[in-house]
């Protein structure tokens, strides 16, 4: 006799689906960011390893992923972020999160980052994770 077992999809797939649903239902949220040059964040500071470790930790705790890495973030083109864009390096990368504490931790760990926040989705920022790259 065959046995049928329910399988649970990996937490990463569930988190991506939940985030997709939130984005498609115009769920307004506050996003926090830490912005740095690509050279600093991707080459000089091995931050990708930190993000991998954090993702693993979230997965073990069945916690929804609330942070993303965005190269050349489009949100900087919003009029309300003109000042941040003026201060941003030409080739930049952002760590974006809905968790303010995580961005504060990033700022403390890295120091040389610009931080801020924005509301999305909005007319100026329809997709908070869009990249110009």
UniProtKB/Swiss-Prot annotation:
It comes from Synechocystis sp. (strain ATCC 27184 / PCC 6803 / Kazusa). InterPro entries: Ycf54 (IPR019616), Ycf54-like_sf (IPR038409). It holds the Pfam family Ycf54. The lineage of its organism: Bacteria, Bacillati, Cyanobacteriota, Cyanophyceae, Synechococcales. This is Ycf54-like protein. It comes from the Bacteria. Belongs to the ycf54 family.
